[in-house]
């Protein structure tokens, strides 16, 4: 804010001096007329929008004070580089990952481990159900289609109940 204040005060002084001395002065018009300069720009003269702060965007090396003969480039202004957060641009992806890398990697690692455990658990359940289906008598199967998980469990419960009843009947006799 301080760097913006000084150029504005200087412009106010220049305007007051030029308007007090001659009301129809062309001095002010020459100072602000961008078409009056016939010099061409090169890439080295044109600052990039990311390297100059917005406060200094109106200050050009071609503006000069009409009464002092001193250009703005000779005045002590500071141009500050803008620092944008890395999350906004994502230009520095490695740095963004480093900031949260440990936590993210641990979460990802835990998720992968849990996924592996779940796969192994589901594989074990599938093998057990396959074994049950193979050990059920053919009368419990539905022909060509394999039993679903629920059907397999229900048929197994019925089969075990029948076997239990047979054992109890044989013990009584």
Curated annotation (Swiss-Prot):
Residues 39-68 have a biased composition (Polar residues). Involved in specifying the paraxial, but not dorsal, mesoderm. May regulate the expression of T-box transcription factors required for mesoderm formation and differentiation, such as brachyury T, wnt8, vegt and eomes. Disulfide bonds: none annotated. It is found in: Nucleus. One of its GO terms (molecular function) is RNA polymerase II cis-regulatory region sequence-specific DNA binding. Keywords: Developmental protein, Differentiation, DNA-binding, Nucleus, Transcription, Transcription regulation. Residues 99-114 have a biased composition (Basic residues). GO terms for biological process: cell differentiation; mesoderm formation; regulation of transcription by RNA polymerase II. GO terms for cellular component: nucleus. It holds the Pfam family HLH. This is Mesogenin-1. It comes from the Eukaryota. Residues 109-163 form the bHLH domain. Residues 39-69, 96-117 are annotated as: Disordered. SUPFAM superfamilies: HLH, helix-loop-helix DNA-binding domain. InterPro entries: bHLH_dom, HLH_DNA-bd_sf, Mesogenin/MesP. PROSITE patterns: BHLH. The gene is msgn1.
């Amino acid at each position: 804010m301080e760097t913006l204040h000084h150029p504005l005060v200087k412009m106010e002084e220049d305007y007051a001096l030029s308007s007090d001395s001659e009301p129809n002065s062309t001095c002010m018009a020459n100072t602000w007329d961008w078409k009056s300069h016939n010099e061409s720009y090169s890439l080295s003269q044109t600052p990039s929008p990311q390297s100059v702060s917005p406060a200094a965007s109106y200050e050009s090396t071609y503006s000069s004070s009409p009464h002092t003969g001193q250009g703005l480039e000779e005045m002590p202004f500071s141009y500050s580089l803008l620092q944008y957060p890395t999350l906004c641009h994502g230009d520095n992806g490695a740095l963004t990952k480093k900031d949260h890398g440990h936590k993210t990697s641990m979460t990802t690692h835990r998720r992968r481990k849990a996924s592996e455990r779940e796969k192994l658990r589901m594989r074990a359940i599938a093998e057990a159900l396959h074994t049950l289906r193979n050990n059920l008598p053919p009368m419990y199967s539905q022909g060509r289609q394999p039993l679903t998980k629920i059907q397999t469990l229900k048929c197994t419960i019925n089969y075990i109940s029948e076997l239990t009843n047979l054992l109890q009947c044989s013990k009584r006799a």
